[in-house]
Structures are given as C-alpha cells and as structure tokens.
Amino acid sequence: MSDQSSDPIVEQFRNQITDTDLAILEAINKRITTVRKLHAYKAEQGYDAVDPSREEWLTQYLQRCNKGPLSNDEVAILWRSIIDSTLREVARLREA
C-alpha cells in the first residue's frame, strides 16, 4: 500500500474538503448570529423563543430543495443537530 499523504490528487481533494468545511462553519456561525438577533427581538416583543412548527417547516423545505447525494433522512438528522446546537449556543450566550 502506498503513502497517500504524498499523493497530490488526495491532497487536492482534501484541500477542497477543508475549504468546504470552513464554508459550512462560517455559515453555521452566521446562522447562530442571526438566531441570536431573532431571539433578542422575540424577547422584546414577548414572543416564544422557539417555534417547533417553523423548525418542522424548515426541515421539510430543505428536504424538498435537496438535490443529493445527501438523503432526505440525513438532511433531517443534520438539520436537527444544527438546530439543537444553535439553541444550545444561544442559551449559553444568554447565560453569560
């Protein structure tokens, strides 16, 4: 078996993956920033902080928009994780 770390094609794919991962991270951080602003506004207005129907709508919308190769089941799992992480982060920042 050869050393894949010296293979330029492997390195090129890895660099593309890293760039994509950074873009995903930036998008998630942007999402959290926007959700924080929304939660602050909702608090000022006396609205409920969480809207489960909106979360369900978003998941279904993203599944309809999904062109693959990620399965719709995985879209739902991934988005539930992102929503949960966002809510935990917003709660953590509120407590700070």
What is the predicted role of each segment?
Residues M1-A96:
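Domain-level signature for soluble enzymes in the chorismate/prephenate branch of the shikimate pathway
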